[in-house]
Amino acid sequence: MHRSDSTMWLKYGLSPPTRSPNAALCAAAATKCASMTRPSCVLDSLTLYSPAWPCLCRYAIFPCRAWAIYVRAGNFILTKFSRFSFCFCVWSPRPPIAAAANHPATSTIVARSQGLRGQDFNFLFVDEANFIKPGAMHTIMGFLNQTNCKLFFVSSTNTGQSSTSLLYNLKGSSNSLLNVVTYICDDHLPEVQQRQNVTTCSCYVLQKPVYVTMDHSVRNTAELFVKDSFMNEIAGGQVGNTLSARSVIASRAMDQFLVYRPSTSNSPNVHNLSRVLTAYIDPAFTANRSASGTGIALVTELNGATVLLGMEHFYLEALTGEAAAEIAQCANLCVAYTCLLHPGVFREVRVAVEGNSSQDSATAIALRLADLLAPLQKRLGFSLVFAHTRQHGSSVAHPFYLLNKQKSRAFDLFISRFNSGNIMASQELVSNTVLLGNDPCEYLVEQIKNLEIVITSGDANRVYSGKQGGKLADDVLVAVVMAAYLSFEGAPPAGYHTVSGAVCRR
């Protein structure tokens, strides 16, 4: 290859191939076709596309507003962008690749598995190995609310099977999932639910904001990932009808939860409280109040029962890089007020920050919260510890909590204890985000009413859903359930440890 070609490969983090006939052929074709006026050709592993000419090849979608050249060498793609170009890339290598062993290629582009929600970025490269399960769709869809978002999905050889790949269904799509921002007011939400090709308010037809860039074909593309993903993850609305759904909470238990609220700041209950306060933070990086928000719950034990002491449902004002700090500040106020209402009671405050959506942001929330609570911690003399998770194959523990299979056990435990009257709310329940407009207990009960169990194939395959009908989000419910679980019997995989600044202390 020429020196300029080698420099271009290194610029994008790829090792220049040595004596690779495919790579040489692609490079030659790229040089030859770059001067064409309206190119649209496929040669071996090279694909060139002209402006506004979407093309489909090997389940790949590359719509561009400007020039984009894709050259494959080994198992990787070199993507050369011109100004103002963007694309949604799904790529599958043509098996077999016999030259891969003789001509290995390395890449620093597709190297990040953690999420970046809540942070400002331009490009996101996702390997299919990180999202072949439908549960990861909720994380991917969260990126679509950011206006300067470009997603690159690099698929593996599993792309050809729908059972192992979410991207297989995208072969019939005509749009890219880029720059997707939508606005739907409460008055027109039912209309969007009923009409499958509507993505924004009808009242914005004449004066459409510049940030509304979605059309019905993009909504269809989103639905190809997971059914009802547009309404659930972007618009915040309905959930598809289930074949088998059962109510799991007795009305008698909900009435008891609303009526009986013991005082936890007065004698004798204050002396019988556990010395451990457990907080669970379920962060959501979205400003759409019809979709998911951040759920925060604080619980402790009182004579064998779980008592809810604090509850927050927090929404960001805007999608900025300060999302982690704002969520930490909300949690800080809730924990601080709870401790001040029960001075000298708690000897340890345990905090679990869920990291399923974004491990980077969860770590930032934990570190920021530790800094904010440091003065109060010194004044009241309690220890502040955070739930840690150890990555597979690593001895390093990080200050976030990954929610996996224990979610079903947590809901089973919550339902059992709630129906038996062992889940209560304190009269001194702290809430800075819910109390202004609603009774926090009634707010939580409304979410509990939506809780259903969906059984697909026997009791072994059951899924709990709290978004029935799209009436309310289930963020507070999930936070309360997980806080009660961690307080009663659950423990993080790597235990609880203190954090200080940017260094986790074991």
Swiss-Prot record:
Look up the EC number in the record and give it: 3.1.-.-
Q: Can you cite an annotated GO cellular component?
A: host cell nucleus
Which positions are catalytic residues? 128, 282, 354, 475
GO MF annotation terms: DNA binding; hydrolase activity
What the entry lists under InterPro entries is as follows: DNA_pack_C, DNA_pack_C_sf, HSV_TRM3
Database matches in Gene3D superfamilies? 3.30.420.320
Q: Name one GO biological process term.
A: chromosome organization
**Keywords on record:** DNA-binding, Host nucleus, Hydrolase, Viral genome packaging, Viral release from host cell
Q: What superkingdom does the record give?
A: Viruses
Q: List the disulfide bonds.
A: none
Where is the protein found, in the record's own terms?
Answer: Host nucleus
Assembly, per entry = Interacts with the terminase subunits TRM1 and TRM2. Interacts with portal protein.
HAMAP family from the UniProt entry: HSV_TRM3
What's this protein's function?
Component of the molecular motor that translocates viral genomic DNA in empty capsid during DNA packaging. Forms a tripartite terminase complex together with TRM1 and TRM2 in the host cytoplasm. Once the complex reaches the host nucleus, it interacts with the capsid portal vertex. This portal forms a ring in which genomic DNA is translocated into the capsid. TRM3 carries an RNase H-like nuclease activity that plays an important role for the cleavage of concatemeric viral DNA into unit length genomes.
Family the entry assigns: Belongs to the herpesviridae TRM3 protein family.
Specify the protein name.
Tripartite terminase subunit 3
- Give me the gene this protein comes from: TRM3
